[in-house]
């Protein structure tokens, strides 16, 4: 198993949830965390613990982004008008690597990030290798010519376990348009996300 896939499943085990809804996730077979102490009964979690877990789960879902990047997303969300938790989700869903994942150009968020960093993704026809770039409504995201025949891209497009959400409009198999910034209810999370607890965590 590659380091990337091992890390992906480690996040699932750490959270105790199949956060991407993958059929091969080890938490489908067991309900305890990673490591030699994973089978111990979990004690009641404090409010701080719940907030921390909510942050780690959301952060992990978006490819285990760095704390610096995640905190910047929160800070930007808190400066916008409206509900900070909704703003945070909107900012995270605008990440280029997430749009590549939502478009089913890649089977995992990690593979999506790799496609971007290797220069296989175009934004409005221009190559972009910055996974954290925030896409705007109306932007077109497309696969480069070499990527269109990649095995991992073809694998992703055949996956039946997830659909392309309404806020990402496909144009054939190689291009999508980011239609609008979604609300929390629109995002197809396989597990419950609690961005309100993330806001509480950073507001302490």
UniProtKB/Swiss-Prot annotation:
Task: Identify the keywords attached in UniProt to this record, alphabetized.
Answer: Ribonucleoprotein, Ribosomal protein, RNA-binding, rRNA-binding
State the family it belongs to: Belongs to the universal ribosomal protein uS4 family.
SMART domains recorded for this chain?
Answer: Ribosomal_S4 (SM01390), S4 (SM00363)
Q: Which Gene3D superfamilies match?
A: Ribosomal Protein S4 Delta 41, Chain A, domain 1, RNA-binding S4 domain
Domain of life (superkingdom): Bacteria
Which CDD domains does the protein's record reference?
Answer: S4
Q: Which PROSITE patterns does the annotation name?
A: RIBOSOMAL_S4, S4
Q: Name one GO cellular component term.
A: small ribosomal subunit
Source organism per entry reads Zymomonas mobilis subsp. mobilis (strain ATCC 31821 / ZM4 / CP4)
GO MF annotation terms: rRNA binding; structural constituent of ribosome
Name the HAMAP family for this protein.
Answer: Ribosomal_uS4_B (MF_01306_B)
Q: Which InterPro entries match?
A: Ribosomal_uS4, Ribosomal_uS4_bac-type, Ribosomal_uS4_CS, Ribosomal_uS4_N, S4_RNA-bd, S4_RNA-bd_sf
The GO biological-process annotations, alphabetized, read as: ribosomal small subunit biogenesis; translation
Indicate the segments forming the S4 RNA-binding domain, all copies.
Answer: 94-157
Q: What does this protein do?
A: One of the primary rRNA binding proteins, it binds directly to 16S rRNA where it nucleates assembly of the body of the 30S subunit. With S5 and S12 plays an important role in translational accuracy.
Could you tell me which residues belong to the region Disordered?
1-46
What is the designated name of this protein? Small ribosomal subunit protein uS4
Q: How does it assemble?
A: Part of the 30S ribosomal subunit. Contacts protein S5. The interaction surface between S4 and S5 is involved in control of translational fidelity.
């Amino acid at each position: 198993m590659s380091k990337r896939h091992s890390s992906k499943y480690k996040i699932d085990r750490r959270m105790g949830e199949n956060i991407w809804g993958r059929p091969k996730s080890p938490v489908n077979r067991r309900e305890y965390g990673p490591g030699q102490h994973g089978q111990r009964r979990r004690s009641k979690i404090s409010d701080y613990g719940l907030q921390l877990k909510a942050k780690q789960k959301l952060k992990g879902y978006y490819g285990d982004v760095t704390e610096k990047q995640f905190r910047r997303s929160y800070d930007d969300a808190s400066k916008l008008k409206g509900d900070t938790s909704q703003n945070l989700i909107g900012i995270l869903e605008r990440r280029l690597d997430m749009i590549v994942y939502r478009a089913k150009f890649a089977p995992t968020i990690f593979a999506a990030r790799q496609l971007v960093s290797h220069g296989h993704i175009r934004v409005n026809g221009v190559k972009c290798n910055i996974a954290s770039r925030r896409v705007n409504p109306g932007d077109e995201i497309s696969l480069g010519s070499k990527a269109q025949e990649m095995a991992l891209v073809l694998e992703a497009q055949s996956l039946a376990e997830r659909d392309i959400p309404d806020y990402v409009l496909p144009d054939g198999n190689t291009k999508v348009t980011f239609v609008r910034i979604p609300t929390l209810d629109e995002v197809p999370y396989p597990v419950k996300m609690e961005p309100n607890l993330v806001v509480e965590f950073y507001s302490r």
